[in-house]
Amino acid sequence: MAETLSSLQDLKAATAVPTEEAPVYAQKLDAFGRAYATGKRKDAVARVWIKPGSGKVTVNGRPLDVYFARPVLRMILQQPLGVAKRVDQYDLMVTVAGGGLSGQAGAVRHGLAKALVNYEPELRSALKKEGFLTRDSRTVERKKYGKKKARRSFQFSKR
């Protein structure tokens, strides 16, 4: 019996697949000690710079509550900081262009999550699990000829 156990353990050790460790990501900072990333959503493109601070957020040179007046949009923007438990620990400087306010808020969220990973690589797994590092590829479907919109047909009359 002892022989069988030892041979089984030898077999298990021989066939064991070595576990691969997760790759170690390096911190990426610019000359001013800031982390930079771009985020996209629909037609909006956001460029985000973060640095340690008191939680001050400027979007296109304006305060956050002025640019994104609706609380829902501000909540979308703050989600990566909440998941990472870093609320009011970073100052954000954002430039965003294109699309509407909802797409812009989503683009800033995507860029902020990527910038957080560039500053603190250990946050990558938590942010990836929540889906903040994934580009939302849903865009407006193009209009087709012979149709009123992308899928809506013209009104049909039998007689």
From Swiss-Prot:
InterPro entries: Ribosomal_Su5_D2-typ_SF, Ribosomal_uS9, Ribosomal_uS9_bac/plastid, Ribosomal_uS9_CS, Ribsml_uS5_D2-typ_fold_subgr
Classification via NCBIfam families: PRK00132.1
HAMAP family, per database record: Ribosomal_uS9_B (MF_00532_B)
Keywords assigned by UniProt, alphabetized: Ribonucleoprotein, Ribosomal protein
Family under the similarity heading: Belongs to the universal ribosomal protein uS9 family.
GO MF assignments: RNA binding; structural constituent of ribosome
Pfam families: Ribosomal_S9
Species this protein is from: Beijerinckia indica subsp. indica (strain ATCC 9039 / DSM 1715 / NCIMB 8712)
GO biological-process terms attached to the record: translation
GO cellular component assignments: cytosolic small ribosomal subunit
Protein name according to UniProt: Small ribosomal subunit protein uS9
Ribonucleoprotein listed as a keyword: yes
